[in-house]
């Protein structure tokens, strides 16, 4: 009944959200939950590239399609805030303007680090407070400790699940079929 009430233009969103309503391993075509542009790009993904993502977490993070695939996986687990925080920190480190540095630092803290932040990442009290203290004089390294903790958490927890997921295994299978 609800599907009848939704306008036709939202069909793509229903497909993406439908995938999210299942457990992450039950969603065989994760490209359905990616935006159109990465979806087209993933069709050009080579088996070699996708296989290299299993070499290390940093290899995955250095590949834009790897990040897109990992983000799609994390969305199915409702834990994409960790990756979004890590990416925001990487972008923050490229900031050259002092005025922008201060405003971006506060925005990232309020979005991801502060207690009850809208997309709060799971870090310990000491790291949160050290990061809060770093905001008194923001620098390009003020989030390094928190970013490192989040990186370790994803590397030890989410990344191994991603590599075992039906989503990733299907991606490898799809890229191998394109070679045949």
UniProtKB/Swiss-Prot annotation:
The keyword Disulfide bond does not apply. GO terms for cellular component: cytoplasmic side of plasma membrane; dendrite; neuronal cell body membrane; nucleus; perikaryon; plasma membrane; synapse. Gene3D superfamilies: 1.10.196.10, Regulator of G-protein Signalling 4, domain 2 (1.10.167.10). Its main location: membrane. Keywords: Cell membrane, Cell projection, GTPase activation, Membrane, Nucleus, Phosphoprotein, Signal transduction inhibitor. PROSITE patterns: RGS. GO terms for biological process: G protein-coupled acetylcholine receptor signaling pathway; G protein-coupled receptor signaling pathway; negative regulation of signal transduction; positive regulation of GTPase activity; regulation of dopamine receptor signaling pathway. It is found in: Cell membrane; Membrane; Perikaryon; Cell projection, Dendrite. The modification Phosphoserine is found at residue 26. It is a peripheral membrane protein. The keyword rRNA-binding does not apply. One of its GO terms (molecular function) is GTPase activator activity. It comes from the Eukaryota. Residues 56-171 form the RGS domain. Interacts with GNAO1. Interacts with GNAI3. Regulates G protein-coupled receptor signaling cascades, including signaling via muscarinic acetylcholine receptor CHRM2 and dopamine receptor DRD2. Inhibits signal transduction by increasing the GTPase activity of G protein alpha subunits, thereby driving them into their inactive GDP-bound form. Modulates the activity of potassium channels that are activated in response to DRD2 and CHRM2 signaling. This is Regulator of G-protein signaling 8.
């Amino acid at each position: 009944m609800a599907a009848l009430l939704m306008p036709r233009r939202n069909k793509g969103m229903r497909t993406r959200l439908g995938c999210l309503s299942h457990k992450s391993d039950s969603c065989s075509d994760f490209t359905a939950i990616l935006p159109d542009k990465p979806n087209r790009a993933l069709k050009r993904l080579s088996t070699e590239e996708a296989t290299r993502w299993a070499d290390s977490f940093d290899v995955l993070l250095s590949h834009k399609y790897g990040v897109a695939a990992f983000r799609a996986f994390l969305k199915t687990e409702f834990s994409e805030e960790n990756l979004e925080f890590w990416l925001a920190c990487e972008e923050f480190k490229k900031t050259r303007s002092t005025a922008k540095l201060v405003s971006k630092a506060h925005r990232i803290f309020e979005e991801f680090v502060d207690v009850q932040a809208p997309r709060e990442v799971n870090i310990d009290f000491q790291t949160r407070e050290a990061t809060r203290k770093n905001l008194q004089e923001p620098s390009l390294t003020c989030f390094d400790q928190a970013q490192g903790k989040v990186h370790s958490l994803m590397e030890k927890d989410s990344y191994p699940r991603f590599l075992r997921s039906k989503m990733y295994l299907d991606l490898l299978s799809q890229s191998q079929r394109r070679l045949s």
